[in-house]
């Protein structure tokens, strides 16, 4: 597969004005960080389990934050209840109690659709505010960006545009391209940016560090992944064993003064991935410890 040729056309405009840092009133407290990074899981890692179990497994793996997704079963005790932005206040209280039990902070929600249907999009942001989230993660309808920006400002909740892999049979799918994502947010409120999915960059033939440089200062969160090969067929492996170059990714995020969360979305070994996830978090912990020992 030919590797994608990086284009810096849109990013160049940002370089002229220096690094743009994403700022928000909702900072992630240091107690939820491993070194300088808030790292935990995207609950989709544990999609064969309930959201309650995903919280517990995140804690078992050493994570301190979690990103939820819509549609996951809430708990194994109530198979009819789902986690989404229409869940009842009663179930939301149960979710918060489970988070408190394992001292896990919820930080994001997605990937969730956002459109010009204001009632539905507003429900997403209202849910995010109720749960105390920093951001929602979406692949929004581009024509809805004005409405989304209005809601971001009103709720002080960020919106991070996610990228799935390039779709050769669907040229209209553009979120895989960091230049396109940047074009949607570059002239808007800084609380609009990217959820940089490192694994999907690799599957699209995009070198992750190059993508992050294009998105300079607009990375709100990241789905951090190391893949076994640089192709659409790549699958997750523990950090340091693949081709994503996780150390370079972490260094680039540090250079950009990234203050968001790293969501481990481990889409392999689905039924027993906690040891692999723990190894990934341990890699970041070791990287941070080694960095602090540098002269």
Residues covered by each model-derived region:
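Bacterial N-terminal signal peptides
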Residues: 9-18
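Conserved beta-strand positions in the central sheet of alpha/beta enzyme cores
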Residues: 67, 108, 137, 160, ...
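Active-site acidic/histidine proton-transfer and metal-coordination neighborhood
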Residues: 92, 98, 102-196, 202-206, ...
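Glycine-rich, proline-tolerant flexible connector loops at the mouths of alpha/beta enzymes
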Residues: 68-94
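Bacterial N-terminal signal peptides that target proteins for export
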Residues: 1-10
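Active-site-adjacent substrate/metal-binding segments within catalytic domains
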Residues: 67-77, 106-115
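Histidine-acidic metal/acid-base catalytic patches
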Residues: 3-4, 22-43, 47-65, 181-196, ...
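A short acidic, helix-capping loop that chelates divalent metal ions and anchors anionic groups
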Residues: 74-81, 167-171, 203, 230-235, ...
